[in-house]
């Protein structure tokens, strides 16, 4: 079992009619039962965004993060910085977001770097259904990877089948999700493929595929039931 608590804010400060300053901050506390991998992290982001048209923006972004473990005898604290360009476009039925850059990690005198790429395409198939493709690669850790999986497949009360480690790893991933929003019924289906290459303990390296499904039925304004299922192989 695991618990991840986030407090986040992302104000946008206009500098001119088409240019804005992006400032963000997040504090996160991750707790993992039966392990010593729990940690707290403080993240700050700074970006300069330019509106290219009524429906598109281009921004230059920098992120700095400090991760401190509950038990420093298990793993050393580390710093992580990322820089990337992001292009975002909102169409009549299609939304597109592309990030491209890199990440540098400083861990007790050692420096590791890796590419940062993220593509998200969201297509409104009908008035009530959407299809979302997400693919990319990033230098990440257990808490961030779990957060991403929950965003893709929804909240899994069992936590799925995650690897919990204090080690960082390069994650390559692709997912496809379909969502149907009815008047009283919501259906979410997702498939996810990923490859993880760990920096220190290579025994954790894995290639995995998974699928999730969630059906929610609202019986009244205050009462609903939910059916959830998941499958994974590695």
Which sequence ranges carry the predicted segments?
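Gram-negative and organellar
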Residues: 1-234
């Amino acid at each position: 079992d695991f618990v991840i608590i986030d407090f986040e804010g992302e104000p946008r400060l206009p500098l001119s009619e088409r240019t804005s300053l992006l400032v963000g901050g997040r504090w996160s506390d991750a707790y993992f039962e039966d392990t010593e991998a729990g940690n707290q992290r403080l993240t700050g982001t700074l970006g300069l965004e330019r509106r290219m048209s009524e429906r598109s923006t281009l921004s230059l972004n920098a992120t700095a993060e400090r991760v401190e473990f509950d038990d420093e005898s298990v793993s050393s604290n580390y710093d992580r910085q990322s820089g990337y360009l992001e292009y975002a476009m909102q169409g009549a039925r299609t939304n597109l977001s592309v990030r491209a850059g890199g990440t540098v990690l400083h861990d007790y005198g050692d420096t590791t770097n890796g590419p940062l790429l993220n593509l998200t395409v969201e297509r409104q198939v009908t008035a009530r259904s959407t299809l979302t493709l997400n693919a990319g690669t990033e230098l990440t850790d257990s808490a961030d990877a779990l957060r991403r999986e929950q965003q893709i497949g929804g909240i899994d009360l069992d936590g799925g089948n995650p690897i919990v480690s204090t080690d960082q790893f390069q994650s390559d991933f692709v997912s496809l999700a379909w969502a149907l929003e009815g008047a009283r019924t919501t259906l979410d289906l997702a498939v996810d493929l990923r490859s993880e290459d760990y920096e220190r303990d290579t025994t954790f390296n894995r290639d995995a595929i998974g699928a999730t499904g969630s059906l929610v039925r609202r019986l009244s304004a205050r009462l609903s039931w939910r059916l959830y299922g998941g499958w994974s192989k590695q």
